[in-house]
Amino acid sequence: MDARILKEDDESGLPNKQADVTLLHGKPTQADAEAAVRTLLLWAGDDPEREGLLETPKRVAKAYKELFAGYTESPEEVLGTVFEEVGGYNDLVLVKDISFHSHCEHHMVPIIGKAHVAYLPDHKVVGLSKIARVVDIFARRLQTQESITAQIADSIQRILKPRGVAVMIEAEHMCMAMRGIRKQGSTTITTTFTGEMQVNAEEQVRFMTLTRR
């Protein structure tokens, strides 16, 4: 298949178009990334050769590798181990106030917020830390809040196969706080539901109530 053809997202939530671009052009090197930072410094009006900026390209490339580590991680690996001995527990499991940092795909500035994630188990559960790790995987990519909300829910539903999933995200977008309209403290809330959580209004109310406690 021609590498220029853009395919649909794979099951990890990572666009296959990224793989196509890599096949076509080759993955940029560390040196390429550092050179790009130097170009941005020059474009901004500063001198990348001055003492305070000499190591900045290397530091920025290293920081971006950490900030966007979600592109190299898979929710399948995180959610692959489940526990079936749950003592008959089959009610809502909620992990709330999961703090995260992401980056807006439009301006590449921070999105800072917290996620509340719940699911109705179908005779099996995962370790609570795994839910937080799934949030981190999708947060450490260029995102919109709507996308990260849907990706978290879809991955848990698809891999764990619970009876239903609920996700709420509350976040402040620096693209609104630092630039443009410059409204600090404005919060965006997104929610999504799957399975029984999608069709049962009482379960939705229970989820929303528990997140506010």
Curated annotation (Swiss-Prot):
Pathway: Cofactor biosynthesis; 7,8-dihydroneopterin triphosphate biosynthesis; 7,8-dihydroneopterin triphosphate from GTP: step 1/1
Membrane-spanning segments: none
Catalytic activity: GTP + H2O = 7,8-dihydroneopterin 3'-triphosphate + formate + H(+)
One Pfam family hit: GTP_cyclohydroI
GO cellular component, one term: cytoplasm
EC number: 3.5.4.16
Binding annotation for Zn(2+): 104, 107, 175
GO BP term, example: one-carbon metabolic process
Highest taxon above the source species: Bacteria
Residue stretches in coiled coil: none
Record keywords: GTP-binding, Hydrolase, Metal-binding, Nucleotide-binding, One-carbon metabolism, Zinc
Enzyme class, spelled out: hydrolase
GO molecular function, one term: GTP cyclohydrolase I activity
NCBIfam families from the UniProt entry: folE, PRK09347.1-2, PRK09347.1-3
Record family assignment: Belongs to the GTP cyclohydrolase I family.
Subunit structure: Toroid-shaped homodecamer, composed of two pentamers of five dimers.
HAMAP family assigned: FolE (MF_00223)
Name of the molecule in the record: GTP cyclohydrolase 1
